[in-house]
Amino acid sequence: MSLPLHPRIGVSTWSLHKSITAGTPLLDIPAQVAAHGMGKLEVCHFHFPRTDAAYLAEFRAALESAGVEFYTLLIDEGDLTSPDRAERDRVLAMITHWIEVAAQVGARRVRVIAGDAAPTEESLRLSKAGLLEVLRHADAHGVRVVTENWHPLLDHPAAIITLMERMEGRLGLKLDFGNWPGDRKYVDLPRIAPLAECTHAKATFPAPGEMDRTDFTRCLDICRDAGFQGPHILIFSDPGDEWDSLDQMREVVLPYAVGTTRRAG
């Protein structure tokens, strides 16, 4: 039985990577997402088998038929802080291509990597310059740009806060539960949660079917306590059945998405 679609719960194709690489067509994914009660989909750029206009129109039609929103196209490569100008130009051209793809298929956002360099003043300058160029193209296509607490430049809250301030509200932030290992996430995620407009809500499964619910709910609590109102995009990358695991995660996230949890104290 299909579940009602929830507009604040979605899934990334990274969570379905095993199925897709085993042969499930990307065109079939929107209907699967809808059947599991999730209203949003994110697609990794490398999961597109083609980017010609005919294929993109077919995928857009599949999304519309399923009633699923293409929330973010995830651009999973590119270093805007490379010291090599030619490499930065190549990265910008690549990102521009995927912005055009996003616009054609109806994606509301693209997620880009802010940089692979350590967060120095020069690397932050290069990142801002590159992101402003990305924004110039994205704005022309009506696509919002977000980045993530991911890769060396944005591996610590201070650098994220600095870059977001310098971008003056033009850049969004995706908060990923799984990018900062160990207990540091419980210290660092609260510092950036007030800036986040969407999450990658990753739960770990130490064994197939056995979710670390304590860690997952602790991360969800951090977002709730920061006043987070955006969508939670579910991320699964452990052994076990993908949809069974994602269904477990959806049940945990649902009270947070409908606002029925309360702060302790």
What positions do the PLM features span?
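Histidine-acidic metal/acid-base catalytic patches
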Residues: M1-G37, G106, R125, L132, ...
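Active-site acidic/histidine proton-transfer and metal-coordination neighborhood
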Residues: L3, A62-E69, I75, L80-G172, ...
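Residues that line or immediately flank small-molecule/substrate-binding pockets and catalytic motifs
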Residues: T13, H45-F48, E77, A114, ...
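Short, conserved active-site loops that position catalytic residues or coordinate cofactors/metal ions
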Residues: H36-H45, T72-G78
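Conserved beta-strand positions in the central sheet of alpha/beta enzyme cores
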Residues: E42, T72-L74, R111, V146, ...
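Glycine-rich, proline-tolerant flexible connector loops at the mouths of alpha/beta enzymes
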Residues: E42-E64, A114-P119
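Positions that flank functional sites
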Residues: F48-P49, G78, A117, L153, ...
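Short amphipathic alpha-helices and their capping/turn segments at secondary-structure boundaries
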Residues: A53-A66, T96-Q104, K185-R191, L220-I222
